C-alpha cells in the first residue's frame, strides 16, 4: 500500500503520525529479507533508526537473531535520546533540495553539525554518499515516512525489555542527533546488555572509529557464532 508521505515539519512537531506504518513494519521487512536470502538467523547490527529496527526484530522475532548490536539509537521514550535544540532547528528549517547539488551541500552542512567533532571531517566521503542517495531517490518521501514511523512507534522500553539475545549498545558522547541518554536507556532496558561509549563520536561513523567498533562487534558476536557452529556439527 502506497501511503502519502507525511509532512516533515508536522512530524518534527509531533503530529501527522500514520499509524499504519511503524517500526514493526520495517522489522517484518527485515525478516522477509532474511527469508529471501535463505538465512535462518543473523547477527543484527543497526545504526540510528536501523538500531530501532534491529531492536524490534530481536524483540518480535527472537528466533531470527543471534546477537544484537545497537549503535547511536534509542528506546523511543519521551525526553530520552532526543536531538539537541540546535539540531531540531536545523531539521525544521531546512528547505527540501531542488537538485542533486543542493542535496549534497545540505548533507555536508548537517553532518558538519551532527558528525563526530572528535575526529577529522571527511567532506569528500559525505558528498559521495549524499550523491548516491540522491541518485537512488531524489525525493524526501521515504525519509519523512520512516521518520513518522519512528514517532508512531512510541516508547518501546517495555518491548525491548523482553530481548534475550546477547546485546551490545554503542553510542558516541558527542551525538547531537540522538543524545547519549538514548544509548544508556537502551542498555538499561535490555537485560544483560553491554554499553560502550565512543569518545568524540557524533551521529556518524568516522573512519577513525571503525577499528574500535569492528573489534567490539567481533568480540560480541564470536561466542554466539561458535555455539551455532558447534550445534550444526552435532546435528
Residue ranges and their predicted role:
Residues 24-42:
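Conserved acidic catalytic loop of the alpha/beta-hydrolase fold
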Residues 163, 169-171:
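Short beta-strand/loop motif that positions the catalytic acidic residue
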Residues 174-178:
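Acidic catalytic loop of the alpha/beta-hydrolase fold
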Amino acid at each position: 500500500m502506497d501511503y502519502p508521505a507525511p509532512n516533515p515539519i508536522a512530524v518534527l512537531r509531533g503530529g501527522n503520525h500514520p499509524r499504519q506504518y511503524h517500526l514493526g513494519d520495517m522489522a517484518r521487512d527485515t525478516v522477509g529479507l532474511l527469508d529471501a536470502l535463505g538465512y535462518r538467523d543473523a547477527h543484527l547490527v543497526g545504526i540510528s533508526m536501523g538500531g530501532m529496527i534491529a531492536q524490534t526484530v530481536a524483540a518480535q522475532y527472537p528466533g531470527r537473531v543471534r546477537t544484537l548490536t545497537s549503535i547511536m539509537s534509542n528506546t523511543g521514550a519521551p525526553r530520552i535520546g532526543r536531538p539537541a535544540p540546535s539540531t531540531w532547528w536545523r531539521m525544521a528549517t531546512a528547505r527540501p533540495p531542488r537538485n542533486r547539488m543542493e542535496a549534497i551541500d545540505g548533507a555536508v552542512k548537517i553532518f558538519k553539525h551532527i558528525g563526530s567533532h572528535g575526529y577529522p571531517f571527511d567532506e569528500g566521503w559525505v558528498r559521495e554518499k549524499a550523491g548516491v542517495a540522491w541518485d537512488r531517490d531524489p525525493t524526501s518521501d521515504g525519509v519523512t515516512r520512516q521518520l513518522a514511523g519512528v514517532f508512531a512507534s512510541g516508547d518501546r522500553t517495555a518491548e525491548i525489555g523482553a530481548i534475550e539475545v546477547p546485546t551490545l549498545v554503542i553510542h558516541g558522547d558527542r551525538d547531537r542527533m540522538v543524545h547519549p541518554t538514548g544509548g544508556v536507556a537502551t542498555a538499561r532496558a535490555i537485560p544483560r546488555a553491554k554499553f560502550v561509549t565512543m569518545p568524540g563520536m557524533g551521529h556518524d561513523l568516522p573512519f577513525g572509529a571503525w577499528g574500535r567498533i569492528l573489534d567490539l562487534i567481533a568480540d560480541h558476536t564470536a561466542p554466539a557464532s561458535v555455539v551455532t557452529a558447534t550445534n550444526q556439527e552435532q546435528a
